[in-house]
UniProtKB/Swiss-Prot annotation:
Record organism: Homo sapiens (Human)
PANTHER family attached to this UniProt entry: COILED-COIL DOMAIN-CONTAINING PROTEIN 24
Cysteine pairs bridged by disulfides in the record: none
Keywords, comma-separated and alphabetical: Coiled coil
Protein's name in the database: Coiled-coil domain-containing protein 24
Chain spans, region Disordered: 223-245, 271-307
Domain of life: Eukaryota
GO BP of this protein: blastocyst hatching
Amino acid sequence: MLRHSPSLWELVEEHVPLRERREVKRILGEAAVDLSLELRAEVAMLRALLQEARSSQAPSSRPISDPSSLLAPPPLLKDLLRQELRQLLQGLRHKAICEGRDQAQAWVQYSPRVLHFALEEPRCDLPEQEIFQMRGGGPSSGHRDLSIIKDQLNVSNIDQVARHLRGLLEEECHTLEREILILQRCLEEEYLRPCHPSEAALEPTLAELKEQKKAMEQELQASVGPSCVSPNHRQRPLGSSTQGLRPPLPLCGVAPLQCCLPAPPLEPYLRPRGQSATHRWGRQLQCSPREGPASTPMSSAAPQAPA
């Protein structure tokens, strides 16, 4: 809540002797002074009603035994978390679209209370900021001016500053009227807000907000699907993983069918006799084109297998 700033007439009363206040009030304008006091009383009443309406809808129905119910986030932290959660939810929806999934299913695994908190429009919390900006963001100009003219605040010299004080009084009334409109709007929005017996339980705790925020960040940091990867990125691991499995080029003078020769366990049956018997299986394929077809040793060795 904004600090209660004294009214212009209250400041005048601090400098005017008691026996002269009635005459000073008549010179300034009794109607204007009474109007400013009535408007200030109305502002105080609306602030009290708004605070009472908000406290009645506060999430106080949670069990006290729940430690997380005592960790309700402050208003400024709530607004910051709401903005961060909205950005994360937008990122999750974009990721679902990129992966070809239904974007309506991108948020189903998260708490409905957190989703409601992140997607709802922030209500008009106590309108200090709006009223503070309306007042100019600083101390009352009337207070500064009165500190300068305090020596003239008496019956003898009041005529010298009466016009200036009437202008300050009129400005104060206009400011109070605008403040009343702001408070009435916030109070109306508060009572028009849907109120259910379980509405207090819809407000998530600070621990729940942080937990869901962390889960969203982890899902966004997870590897994306193949549809979100560029073709160059997909082909790079494919080539590197199959490079060692690529069949060797055909040797010079060897028929293409010999690329499908049986595995080395059949080597004892196909090993030729003589000096070439000391050669290994792979070296036997390295023959020159002048040595004739490579299928000759196989055809000569095949009938020797039964012997």
